[in-house]
Amino acid sequence: MTVGVLALQGDFREHCAVLRRIGVEPIEVRLPHQLAQVDHLIIPGGESTTIGRLLAIYQMLEPIRTRGGCDLAIWGTCAGAILLANEVMDQKQGGQPTLGLMNLTIRRNAYGSQLDSFEAPITMPIIGEEPLPGVFIRAPQIMALGQGCEAVGWLEDGSVVAARQGRLLATTFHPELTHDDRVHRLFLEL
């Protein structure tokens, strides 16, 4: 298994640090030849429009779309989850490049601005009974799940904050900003 972390923008360093802590040496993916070397890819939080545009500039949108969910497991956190969604609400004017690989509808910045960021416990039975610490920074919200896409994580109010579709995983929160590595370990099993 070879794990890559998309390193164009956002908090890729934090994901790399967690992977190293659990014994995995990641490849920082910035170019198509690096993407071709990995079978697991983390798309980090950051700014989804910027990451999408950089994926287009560096000609990685189509290779990721082609391989995503087949021979490439993908996990998108926050902005990465937006990029994975096949429907994005509240896009910037003019739209934004996305991968559209997961059958889910997501709303950008659903909880408000940077000042409205928060932490809350997450129920995620797929990784264990103990609640997961959730860090939400300008977080999107999963509004609807389509065929083949299942909810795997919830806030106390029932809001879906994690979804899985085969080898694709989307989280609207930032596990890489906590000391809990269970979601990273789950991703490695996809």
UniProtKB/Swiss-Prot annotation:
GO terms for biological process: glutamine catabolic process; pyridoxal phosphate biosynthetic process; pyridoxine metabolic process. Gene3D superfamilies: 3.40.50.880. The active site is at residues 78, 174, 176. Keywords: Glutamine amidotransferase, Hydrolase, Lyase, Pyridoxal phosphate. PROSITE patterns: PDXT_SNO_2. It catalyses: aldehydo-D-ribose 5-phosphate + D-glyceraldehyde 3-phosphate + L-glutamine = pyridoxal 5'-phosphate + L-glutamate + phosphate + 3 H2O + H(+); L-glutamine + H2O = L-glutamate + NH4(+). GO terms for molecular function: glutaminase activity; pyridoxal 5'-phosphate synthase (glutamine hydrolysing) activity. InterPro entries: Class_I_gatase-like (IPR029062), PdxT/SNO (IPR002161). Its EC number is 4.3.3.6, 3.5.1.2. Pathway: Cofactor biosynthesis; pyridoxal 5'-phosphate biosynthesis. It comes from the Bacteria. L-glutamine binds at residues 46-48, 108, 137-138. It holds the Pfam family SNO. One of its GO terms (cellular component) is cytosol. In the presence of PdxS, forms a dodecamer of heterodimers. Only shows activity in the heterodimer. Belongs to the glutaminase PdxT/SNO family. HAMAP family: PdxT. Catalyzes the hydrolysis of glutamine to glutamate and ammonia as part of the biosynthesis of pyridoxal 5'-phosphate. The resulting ammonia molecule is channeled to the active site of PdxS. This is Pyridoxal 5'-phosphate synthase subunit PdxT. It comes from Chloroflexus aggregans (strain MD-66 / DSM 9485).
